Regions:
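A generic structural signal for beta-strand entry/edge sites
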Residues: 20-24, 60-62, 80-84
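Short, charged, intrinsically disordered terminal tails
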Residues: 105-107
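Negatively charged, low-complexity tracts enriched in Asp/Glu with abundant Ser/Thr
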Residues: 2-56
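Short, compact, well-ordered microdomains
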Residues: 64-103
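Amphipathic, interaction-prone secondary-structure segments
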Residues: 47-73
C-alpha cells in the first residue's frame, strides 16, 4: 500500500553513488538495522516503488521492489553498514539513474 504524499516521512540521505558495472545505486545514510523499515518504507515511497517481498537475516535486509515493471532489490548489510539498490539486467540501469535523480532532493 502506498501512502499519500502528505503522509510520507522525510528521508535523510548523506550520499548516493551509481555503479554501472555492479548495476547498483549505493545509498549512504544513518540506518538502524533493527529499525530498517523506518528508513526503507519512506525511501520506497519517495521512489514510487512497490514492495513485493521482504527478507531479512542475522545481518542483512533484502527487499524485492518494483518500479514501473522493473524489479529491483533494496539491500542493507549491517556489518558493512551499506545500503544499495540493484538491478538484475543491464538494460534496467537507466531506471537506477532515474531513481538517483529522485534521491538528489533528499541529500
Amino acid at each position: 500500500m502506498k501512502l499519500p504524499s502528505s503522509h510520507i516521512k522525510a528521508i535523510s540521505i548523506d550520499a548516493i553513488s551509481l555503479d554501472k558495472n555492479a548495476l547498483s545505486l549505493s545509498i549512504s545514510a544513518d540506518i538502524d538495522f533493527d529499525r530498517f523499515a523506518d528508513f526503507a518504507e519512506p525511501l520506497v515511497a519517495a521512489l514510487d516503488c512497490t514492495v513485493r517481498e521482504r527478507q531479512w537475516g542475522a545481518d542483512r535486509h533484502q527487499w524485492l521492489l518494483e518500479f514501473e515493471g522493473t524489479q529491483l532489490c533494496l539491500n542493507y548489510e549491517f556489518y558493512g553498514n551499506i545500503c544499495w539498490l540493484s538491478a538484475e539486467r543491464e538494460a534496467d540501469f537507466d531506471v537506477l539513474e532515474y531513481l538517483a535523480t529522485l534521491l538528489k532532493s533528499h541529500l
